[in-house]
């Protein structure tokens, strides 16, 4: 039961944080590139790598890794925005978004793990 509470608590704060950051960017940027989702997912990849690399206890992994990072990052929004770019025939931005998210995401996860100690 405690494990579920840790995941739920982290998830609550992760979702609220993502919501706030997304809204902040929407009010300040006018671009076809989905910058908020990109930065959230890249930051999440780095932080999750750092959490895992740091070797924190299972409780912290559940709270921060599974809970917070699971709700903070957003695979579904990433895919939805990719489809929207495709439907709008904005293929150059789509290619940039897909390649940057995957390449930089993997690099940042690796960097986080290295800085965390793995």
Curated annotation (Swiss-Prot):
Keyword Oxidoreductase tagged: no
Inhibition and activation profile: Na(+) is not transported, but it plays an essential structural role and its presence is essential for fluoride channel function.
> Membrane topology for this entry?
Multi-pass membrane protein
Stated role: Fluoride-specific ion channel. Important for reducing fluoride concentration in the cell, thus reducing its toxicity.
Could you identify this protein by its name?
Answer: Fluoride-specific ion channel FluC 2
The record's gene field reads fluC2
Question: Which UniProt keywords are listed?
Answer: Cell membrane, Ion channel, Ion transport, Membrane, Metal-binding, Sodium, Transmembrane, Transmembrane helix, Transport
Bilayer-spanning residue ranges: 1-21, 33-53, 55-75, 93-113
Would you identify the family this protein belongs to, as annotated?
Answer: Belongs to the fluoride channel Fluc/FEX (TC 1.A.43) family.
Q: Which InterPro entries match?
A: FluC (IPR003691)
Q: Which GO terms describe its molecular function?
A: fluoride channel activity; metal ion binding
Keyword Signal among record annotations: no
PANTHER family this protein is in? FLUORIDE EXPORT PROTEIN 1-RELATED, FLUORIDE-SPECIFIC ION CHANNEL FLUC 2
- Species of provenance: Bacillus cereus (strain ATCC 10987 / NRS 248)
**Which residues bind Na(+) per the record?**
70, 73
